[in-house]
Amino acid sequence: MNEKKNLLNGYIVSNKMNKSAVVIVERKIKHSIYKKFIKKRTKLCIHDEKNICNIGDIVTIRECRPISKTKSWILVNILEKSIV
């Protein structure tokens, strides 16, 4: 039961929900024909137990068991606070 869970970095785009936030995770993939790198984005709902995230923060998130219908990621730490 001590397997390594997925860790991702992203930035907060919404924190209007109680104990929740929305994170955008960007990744680069290489196009199979044109060999050009393309940015892909994924929106993930995360669990923020202490409501410490603000919009623009760069965070690390970890995969966990499903907490609700859309939340299956939790906040690990905040890498950089936003200047708002």
UniProtKB/Swiss-Prot annotation:
PROSITE patterns for the chain: RIBOSOMAL_S17
GO CC annotation terms, alphabetical: cytosolic small ribosomal subunit
CDD domains in UniProt: Ribosomal_uS17
GO biological process entries: translation
KW rRNA-binding (keyword) present: yes
InterPro entries, per the entry: NA-bd_OB-fold (IPR012340), Ribosomal_uS17 (IPR000266), Ribosomal_uS17_bact/chlr (IPR019984), Ribosomal_uS17_CS (IPR019979)
Entry keyword set: Ribonucleoprotein, Ribosomal protein, RNA-binding, rRNA-binding
One GO MF term: structural constituent of ribosome
Record NCBIfam families: PRK05610.1, uS17_bact
Family to which the UniProt record says this protein belongs: Belongs to the universal ribosomal protein uS17 family.
Described function: One of the primary rRNA binding proteins, it binds specifically to the 5'-end of 16S ribosomal RNA.
Protein name as catalogued: Small ribosomal subunit protein uS17
Source organism: Buchnera aphidicola subsp. Cinara cedri (strain Cc)
